[in-house]
Curated annotation (Swiss-Prot):
InterPro entries in UniProt: Nucleoside_phosphorylase_sf, Pur_nuclsid_perm
Signal peptide (residue range): 1-22
Organism name: Candida albicans
One cellular component (GO) term of this entry: endoplasmic reticulum
UniProt-recorded name of the protein: Purine nucleoside permease
Disulfide bonds: none
An example Gene Ontology molecular-function term: catalytic activity
GO biological process: nucleoside metabolic process; transmembrane transport
Amino acid sequence: MKLSTLFTLATTISTLTTFTIASPVVVVEKRAINETALAEDIPTTKNNHAQASYGKPFAIYQPKAFIISMFSLERDPWLKAMDFVHNITIPGLSPVYPDIHCTTNYTICQITTGEGEINAASSISALTLNPLFDLTKTYFLVGGIAGGEPNYTTIGGVTFAKYAVQVGLEYQLAYEDYHKTNPDWISGYIPYGTDDQNTYPGNVYGTEVFEVNEKLRDRAVELASKVHLNNGTEGNAKFRKLYNETAAQGLPKVVKCDSLTSDNYFTGNVLNDYFANFTLLMTNGSATYCSTAQEDNATLEVMTRLAKHGLVDYDRIMIMRTISDFSRPPPSMSAYEYFFNRSDGGISASLENLVIAGTPIIHDIVQNWDKIYKSGEKYSSKNYVGDIFATLGGKPDFGKESFDTA
């Protein structure tokens, strides 16, 4: 197809698209990468290596902030708090959550991915690759509820992560299969490519550890620390007192600590102790495990891949988890009794605190867009950001010199 014909077709499609939108499209400044996407010569190759061009020359929406929820309970408080008047359906989203919600001028948008790693990766891929959305300067707030480690937080507490660690990528043996031969093992998990729980994995998939922008995380914490959190119910207060840890007994507050990702919903002292050690192992002692989630590493893997090609800015991602329950029982209960008969009831406070703690950074981004956030310079990362493979450049402050890739 001739380039002139392509431009004519594109103009026609753009015009038709405009007529199908219920409300006026906000005219916004286009990125240089998009302005030149179709003006480039078609590349030639002599080695059979065809490389696709990228950019979204016909993007309509350029949100400043995007809230990522995982399921309806995390989504609903945002829908009540924000003036989301537009519903945008795009291919590839969860069949349960097929719509993206945006404010009147499309400045703030929200997506619900569906729970678990596969749903998160699928939905975020669909969003970031969709031609209607230019996300090159968008800030992302992953906001969900999680289990909490009582050493560092309490029910209703708010956590902002620097690291996300995927703990499910390991070998696993049942207790009956290892306790006689390896009685000193904490659990039946063993890192890939090793036969020792205290040895760094010999081979990796690349999604085991992610690190996000510490300066932006700290800004979000600074703003969230100024608001009054929901402290929960009298029942929450009584349940907190069943724990010995100071953090668990206290009122909810905003803390800097890190997130674990596992599709397996785990609980109890045995697995918590092991995964706490595994977190230290995987991050060379840098991360502090305090929240259990099911999606963060999946979301960050998609963001890493797309950031490599300039479709998102990995420096503009924040991970916030509020605590709906403890990840281990109080001393007076067994793990079984706690998990199946618990009465901590912290989910209400955790859901309200998603909005209470997340709104300040969202508003700060929108209100100070031209002065601070558009360029991203003030809160650009000084720490390493990215995955264990250094996909985005730099040198990870975790991992080891080389791996076998699985």
